[in-house]
Amino acid sequence: MAIKIDGDINQYIKLVGRSDESVKTEVQHIIDELGCTPIIQEIDEEFLACDETKTNWLLRDSGVDFAWENDRLEAIFLYTQHLYAEYSVYSGSLFSQFSNTATRDDIVQCLGKPEGQGKWNQSWIRYNNPNGTWTNFEFDDDLRLRMVTICMPVV
């Protein structure tokens, strides 16, 4: 069952899965607002299927990555804790009901039972969005939010 998450996270949720002309313009607008220049990382074609392209727009100074596949925005990664030396923490408030470093229990209390959960490298929970995408919450060892991923469902 899809759940609507309140807050500025929606500016990102509405973009994932789109490949229309305006999606890159909307992403560029966000980049301009964040005030940084992305590092464009093209994935080598020898690792991809025929006629497939994958590109990552890394906004390390803002704690955001955009992952593109064949001109469709496949995923957005928002780093809410300092995970990697080269990345800053996302500074904006993403959620109206809880903080960017809320506990797993706080998030479940606000959003209800997750659609998926597990532990792969770190503990995570997943909610389905109304637009058919997923929002994944990944937690540190103290079960505090460390990264939010909005992505297309894994098939």
Regions found by a protein language model. Give the residues of each.
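Short aromatic-glycine motifs in intrinsically disordered, low-complexity regions
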Residues: G92-F98
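A cross-family detector of function-defining hotspots
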Residues: A2-F77, L83, S99-V155
